């Protein structure tokens, strides 16, 4: 019998890039509920900038409604927006998620809108720490590629519960055609004027499939993502494995990827991510990760880095964090630096 694990899907959608979450329920009754959630964070450090400064990590606010419409079907809708509450201005809010979904214990779950993708269900198992996590999943064009959050996607997921501790899951995703416009700033001569380059990319229909299994706390998965960009087929294979629950005892995850025209348009790349973490009963969680991307044709490392991080849950909804990311070098002549930060995240 096909049985959808709604709790697992909710956790994958909401918590996979954070350590904890909470939401304030503002209405519940007659099979309908409405909740507001999200978090804000601040840190002090050298965080992907040249100087030590106060910064944010990835604050957001969301609103989610659920309605039981009978016959075992629950319809839900969610909107989530990233916050720029330190600088403000015209870009104080940016869309992260926006979808309507329907779930049934046997029939599975269908979602339409901007959402976390089935690809990410497999590829995101190491994308856990607050400050420094899996960067290659968020490379340029990731919304259109569907490598983490996927823009304007139709997805379907279901889980087969083989036994009390064995479950097999699969997911399908589709994105339609679109033309994406991007801008990039450069400074050919320093000092000199800033040059802004605008490029267009034509995305054909894209599809992805994800298959995974959980065997008494040990998970394995495979996902495939493909579709043309301009005249090239941009495709990606990801294999992952993970063990445990992040923040509770031992957690370990490995991600290996092989891409063609997928990561920043490079013809062939390999990508690697490894994470090991240990969560103590007193709320302390310690982790170390490693990540790199290699150009297979030139055998040149695009970037490589490793981070040591500590997160401490003071109380439910309040987490402090500190991390140091070591630059391990590249083979393409780009100047890179170590980064570090310490901060606090408040959930509401």
Regions found by a protein language model. Give the residues of each.
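Cleavable N-terminal export/targeting peptides
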Residues: 1-31, 189-192
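Cleaved targeting-peptide boundary
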Residues: 23-29, 182-184, 334
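Outer membrane beta-barrel
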Residues: 24-46, 50-177, 212-216
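Residues that define the transmembrane beta-barrel architecture of outer-membrane proteins
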Residues: 32, 51-59, 93-96, 148-152, ...
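Transmembrane beta-strands of outer-membrane beta-barrel pores
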Residues: 42-48, 81-85, 116-118, 174-178, ...
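Repeated loop/turn-to-beta-strand initiation elements of outer-membrane beta-barrel proteins
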Residues: 72-75, 106-110, 163-170, 216-222, ...
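Outer-membrane beta-barrel "beta-signal"
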Residues: 154, 312-314, 336-348
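Detector for outer-membrane/organellar transmembrane beta-barrel domains
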Residues: 190-193, 197-199, 204-307
């Amino acid at each position: 019998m096909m049985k959808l694990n709604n709790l697992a899907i909710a956790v994958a959608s909401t918590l996979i890039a954070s350590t904890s979450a909470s939401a304030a329920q503002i209405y519940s009754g007659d099979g309908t509920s409405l909740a507001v959630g999200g978090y804000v964070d601040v840190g002090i450090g050298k965080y992907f900038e040249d100087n030590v400064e106060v910064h944010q990590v990835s604050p957001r606010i969301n609103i989610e409604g659920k309605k039981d419409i009978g016959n075992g079907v629950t319809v839900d809708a969610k909107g989530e927006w990233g916050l720029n509450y330190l600088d403000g201005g015209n870009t104080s809010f940016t869309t992260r998620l926006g979808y309507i979904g329907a779930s049934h214990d046997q029939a599975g779950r269908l979602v339409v809108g901007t959402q976390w993708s089935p690809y990410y269900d497999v590829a995101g198992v190491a994308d856990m720490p607050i400050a420094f996590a899996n960067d290659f999943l968020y490379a340029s064009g990731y919304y259109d590629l569907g490598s983490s959050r996927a823009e304007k996607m139709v997805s379907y997921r279901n889980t087969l519960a083989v036994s009390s501790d064995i479950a097999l899951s699969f997911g399908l995703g589709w994105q339609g055609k679109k033309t994406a416009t991007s801008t990039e700033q450069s400074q050919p001569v320093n000092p000199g004027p800033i040059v802004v380059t605008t490029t267009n990319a034509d995305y054909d229909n894209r599809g992805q499939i994800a298959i995974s299994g959980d065997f008494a706390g040990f998970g394995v998965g495979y996902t495939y993502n493909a579709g043309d960009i301009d005249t090239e087929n941009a495709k990606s294979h990801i294999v992952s494995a993970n063990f445990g629950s992040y923040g509770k005892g031992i957690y370990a995850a490995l991600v290996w990827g092989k891409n063609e025209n997928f990561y920043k348009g490079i013809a062939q790349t390999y990508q690697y991510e490894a994470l090991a973490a240990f969560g103590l009963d007193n709320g302390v969680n310690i982790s170390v990760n490693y990540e790199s991307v290699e150009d297979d044709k030139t055998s040149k490392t695009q970037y490589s880095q490793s981070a040591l991080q500590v997160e401490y849950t003071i109380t439910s909804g309040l987490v402090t964090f500190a991390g140091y990311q070591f630059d391990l070098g590249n083979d393409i002549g780009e100047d890179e630096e170590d980064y570090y930060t310490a901060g606090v995240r408040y959930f509401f």
